[in-house]
Amino acid sequence: MNRKRLIMVVCIFTTCLLLSAQKRYQRVISLVPSITQNIYYLKAESRLVGCTSYCTPALADKKEVVATAIEANVEKIVLLKPDVVIVSTLTSPKDIATMRKFGIEVVEFASAKSFEEICSQYIALGKMLEKQTEAEKTIDECKAKIKKLSKTLRWNVVPKIFFQIGADPIFAVLDNTFMGEYISMLGGKNIASKLEHGIVSREFVISQAPDFIFITSMGISSEEEAKTWKRYTTLPAVKNNRIFIVDANKACQPTPITFIETLEEMTKMCKQRR
């Protein structure tokens, strides 16, 4: 084989590999609601063929439901012939093993513990779906917004903040979580910063005298919780009318866009009652 023909063969082979890589994940199943949301943010929803019963945007598009939050219907998944199934640490190891036994590629995304991890996962997903440039642009925009927001709040005294994400039992957002970063990025001090577990008593919260109380929306219970806290009139958060309800669908979802939207909302709330 002469040199010219060899170069041509190499070029054809390389092109085939690239085309194969580009078409690798044309049929995607997501068993992670936040990943499903990110697929929509990346405008790659046309590749999504299956989702969980908690994947709101996909349900609206009538995508095939193949799982609950923790239990997958493997038979249904196999019938959809996916190129890849994206799972989380909540997905049953048995289900993952069964899918792999059927020759299905399974990619696991761990639960993001920080905004940086959220960003890394978004870019990793972008690479999988040939949307890396778009993903990196979104992350750059989100980080620029954080930088801008950090300049809008200035405190004379660092405020103590309680962020509640459960009512029965009362559950506090901890440090070293992506939701804990809402508090640090607001320039506040988390009253639960020294705790190892999130379950707290009402007495504990009262003893910490928070300046702000944020409660994630939990239907009627969030409104009831706000009313309950308002009975404790000695609390600084009550005295200064600083009890706020935050959209749980955004605050609890580890995606870069919902993270920024929540931070913007909380910053606005703080500025109103500074």
PLM regions and their residue ranges:
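A short, structured surface patch at a secondary-structure boundary
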Residues: R27-T91, D95, I191-K194
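His/Asp/Glu-enriched short active-site or ligand-binding loop at hydrolase and phosphoryl-transfer sites
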Residues: T52, N176-G198, I245
